Amino acid sequence: MWFVYILLCEDNSLYTGYTNNVSHRFSDHKNGKGGHYTRSHKPIKIIYSEQLPTQSQALKRELEIKSWSRKKKINTLKLVLMEKNS
């Protein structure tokens, strides 16, 4: 299984990535071994993850989410939270 995830960073920015192990990848990001962006924008929390069956699908979804505006990402996350709480 593969996952797309969104991290909240210390400066309130969002980082989107994909992996086959979210907790391990988050640890990499926190320890400066993740993506270039998270070396200068320290991640503090995983705020979203989505499971996909293949690496190819995860990469496509990552690119789709990365193309969204910050506003669209936040609105989508709000909808997901509302669905989980209902």
Regions found by a protein language model. Give the residues of each.
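GIY-YIG nuclease catalytic motif and its immediate N-terminal context
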Residues: 1-34, 39-52, 56-76, 80-86
